[in-house]
């Protein structure tokens, strides 16, 4: 059992393990194909790019009120593999069309679930799960890789607010 396994607690289901490098090998060709790349970083094109996604995946857009009734505000978007459908709010979709990094990250995260082929399976293992088996980490990594290829900053600052010892 690795230290990583001891420190890591996963919520939800397991998927096929993938390293960051394996996710990059999936994400970058998809980003290029869908024209999610730095040289296409023109806000006017994002709406067109997101509209062309409808050829690959259904996108259902809900009003904020409908979404809150449906999800109780627990999530900003959802991907259903059985229906090949991404569901999100009108606000998130519109912000993504305008090139908002956080909104694009939400849509790309859900696309990550689709392109990384996340399915819920029954799974029995005597080994504790690792982060590489976490579908949320994988989808976050997929989104991060594409956002970086588009020229967005994804690394967050870590600030230490603890008072220095005297």
Annotated model-derived regions:
Residues 1-166:
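Active-site hotspot residues in diverse enzymes, especially metal/ion-binding acidic/histidine motifs
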